[in-house]
């Protein structure tokens, strides 16, 4: 299953609301792209505010899920209007890479490899697959691209924009207090973001010569640990209690 972000501008949506809800129910993110796609630089703030809120309300009413990200119409990020768009969001799209008629297997693979090499996040954006603006000349090229990304899942994490934006924000805001003892670590996380908005678990990596066995517990629950030759990896709750790590 490949989850994606669908950016909806409701006044011109070419899907029924039942189809949009079906996508949402299957785990795809439905994001806000403005009710009438109003360019922030060309309309008064009150019209921009209405355009954003009206789309939020329509998406929530028809899917049951409030959009927590925003995609700027025409990529215009006028500062005063941007202050409205970011309210009650985990993030807004400030960069993207267009994927469509000009995409080749080579430049798509190069893009992904560069993201891996530079430890960066990438936001792929396509308007249409088989028809519409900048649609693929051969739609199979897009599916092949997804298969290539899937084959690299040990090196790359693919998530919806909401998931990735929340993760990045949480990672930057989380403080870890670490006490090292013999064959034991006590790690206390602290995160003060809005836990109703920022709900992603974080991943902790312990690097070094691998032990035969590593176990981790938080709030009385065992945390699944992935062991590699040079590191151990596990997810944890940044709002939770002390993480006890035993190294054997």
Regions found by a protein language model. Give the residues of each.
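C-terminal beta-strand-rich structural cap/linker in extracellular carbohydrate-active enzymes
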Residues: 228-248
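Metal-dependent polysaccharide deacetylase catalytic core of the NodB/CE4 family, i.e.
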Residues: 5, 9-100, 119-132
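Extracytoplasmic cysteine-anchoring/structural motifs
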Residues: 115-116
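Catalytic domains of carbohydrate-active enzymes, especially glycoside hydrolases
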Residues: 1
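C-terminal domain-boundary segment and adjacent tail
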Residues: 12, 60, 91-96, 100-103, ...
């Amino acid at each position: 299953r490949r989850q994606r972000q669908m950016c909806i501008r409701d006044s011109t949506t070419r899907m029924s609301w039942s189809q949009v809800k079906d996508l949402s129910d299957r785990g795809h993110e439905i994001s806000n792209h403005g009710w009438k796609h109003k360019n922030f630089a060309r309309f008064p703030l009150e019209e921009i505010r209405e355009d954003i809120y009206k789309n939020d309300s329509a998406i929530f009413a028809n899917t049951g899920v409030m959009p927590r990200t925003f995609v700027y119409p025409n990529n215009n990020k006028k500062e005063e209007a941007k202050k409205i768009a970011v309210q009650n969001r985990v993030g807004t799209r400030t960069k993207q890479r267009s994927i469509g008629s000009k995409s080749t297997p080579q430049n798509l693979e190069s893009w992904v490899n560069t993201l891996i090499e530079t430890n960066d996040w990438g936001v792929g954006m396509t308007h249409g697959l088989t028809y519409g603006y900048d649609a693929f000349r051969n739609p199979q090229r897009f599916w092949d691209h997804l298969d290539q990304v899937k084959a690299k899942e040990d090196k790359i994490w693919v998530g919806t924009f909401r998931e990735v934006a929340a993760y990045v924000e949480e990672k930057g805001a989380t403080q870890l207090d670490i006490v090292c003892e013999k064959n034991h670590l006590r790690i206390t996380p602290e995160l003060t973001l809005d836990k109703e908005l920022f709900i992603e678990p974080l991943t902790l990596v312990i690097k070094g010569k691998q032990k035969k066995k590593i176990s981790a517990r938080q709030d009385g629950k065992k945390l699944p640990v992935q062991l590699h030759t040079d590191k151990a990896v596990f997810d944890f709750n940044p709002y939770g209690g002390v993480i006890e790590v035993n190294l054997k």
